[in-house]
């Protein structure tokens, strides 16, 4: 078991080598992206060895400590926790990133700053690995903030576009709201347990304490885009497609769920936090599934499906099954990265067109991408014996036998069936029917960088679920065996979604709305949430500040206080000290009457 830290460290050294060799100016050469891709592939191969050793060893965790510094009574160490979660997630993240980097060599080929782009992708991956291997809150916070700042830089990669800048700022602001909860939880743990080591926190913190767990839940809501802090996730589609694939598959968005999995020993004895997590996840998965139904941007549909799956992971943690949430994180990474890469292939082939209404008939011109997109969509919906089935089936089985919050579980079932609806919609609009794009577009997918990357993820989307689930040790008591009619519920929910999608598409194919319905507008405008939150408060605050400045500064001080008040004071003073009333017209009239009478008497 002493080999585990060494092999993991070797994997990290291989990963960081392209950055460590910066003094040699290697990052200025044309081959730097290939060096980075090779480093990630070698790191993946090395990381498979400790994962295999650990799975067959039967150990619970291996912890490596290097003392760093002591501040009064607080001891800070570089501490790595190599347990099932970190050692399984590392190869998954490295494998997916390897494929994404190979895809980026094709997709970002014409970008003049491709070397910097690959360096950012590599740093993004390194900070995520720091986060998952951390054994104390200090290291975890470094990884947490690292993925945050790298997401900001990558979402705003095309900084010449206003939308990209706005999306990057939006991601940063929403994550700062979540970070408030994380920092508050860190402060609470330091105050009450005098340590940031996870084992000491689990031993010393009372199990029923809700305050720090609320902070951690807020942090997870911000990072994993749960309802209320969700708008940044679809906006992040303004970044390049490889960024979307990496962001949504194995790095930033799953960091919040991973944080709650790490702290599940505290959460499992706290029913109020579990219920809150369950309700937040259920609302998120339903709301984002509804929003995905009417979107027309192919990347935004896949982004909302990510948010819906994150809600499902939160529901799984809420029913006290963190190992199933982790299994879904791992399986979800493969097919979600592949779906984004397929959408990138379509967008690139159609001249940066992202509207699914302007696609169609691509199954003839892009057969390989079509195959991958259909397999990815089926895996996302939970089709039996594809990767997504092994996690979604277990999650729905656990939900069916759970006794908490029937309404939350019911809306999660509804949202799961909607997964099949929007997946079918993507297939129907992009691949089937007649072409709706300009005829002079040159479509070509015969590039090894594209096909090899998608092939690897396609194999992962078929076989990875079986391999990971067969080596999954449950961290909590698994649900009991259930009757066959409940066992087939996952398949029934998926088939119901497919049937509903086909029925709706055939029913509404020739249907034209003069005015969109309220339900359609609610879904298409994202529940009016961006309008209410992003426009109304700024409008109200700007109006208030303008009124205050114009009323207090201009009207009160510059107008009423000095000029008008001086005139008013002089007028009232002259009125007070004067003998006459100042009625000039009356005086002239009396003078005229007297003059007239005098003239009449004289004449």
From Swiss-Prot:
A Pfam family recorded for this sequence: NADH5_C
Name of this chain's protein: NADH-ubiquinone oxidoreductase chain 5
Record-linked InterPro entries: NADH_DH_su5_C (IPR010934), NADHpl_OxRdtase_5_subgr (IPR018393), ND/Mrp_TM (IPR001750), NU5C-like (IPR003945), Proton_antipo_N (IPR001516)
Membrane topology, from the record: Multi-pass membrane protein
Catalytic activity entry: a ubiquinone + NADH + 5 H(+)(in) = a ubiquinol + NAD(+) + 4 H(+)(out)
Membrane-spanning residues: 4-24, 38-58, 87-107, 117-137, 140-160, 171-191, 211-233, 241-261, 273-293, 301-320, 331-351, 366-386, 409-429, 457-477, 488-508, 583-603
Cell inner membrane as UniProt keyword: no
EC number(s) on file: 7.1.1.2
Example of a GO biological process term: electron transport coupled proton transport
Role description: Core subunit of the mitochondrial membrane respiratory chain NADH dehydrogenase (Complex I) that is believed to belong to the minimal assembly required for catalysis. Complex I functions in the transfer of electrons from NADH to the respiratory chain. The immediate electron acceptor for the enzyme is believed to be ubiquinone.
A molecular-function term among this protein's GO annotations: NADH dehydrogenase (ubiquinone) activity
Entry's localization field: Mitochondrion inner membrane
Primary site of residence: mitochondrion
GO annotation, cellular component aspect: mitochondrial inner membrane
NCBIfam families linked: NDH_I_L
Protein family (similarity comment): Belongs to the complex I subunit 5 family.
Enzyme class: translocase
Assigned keywords, A-Z: Electron transport, Membrane, Mitochondrion, Mitochondrion inner membrane, NAD, Respiratory chain, Translocase, Transmembrane, Transmembrane helix, Transport, Ubiquinone
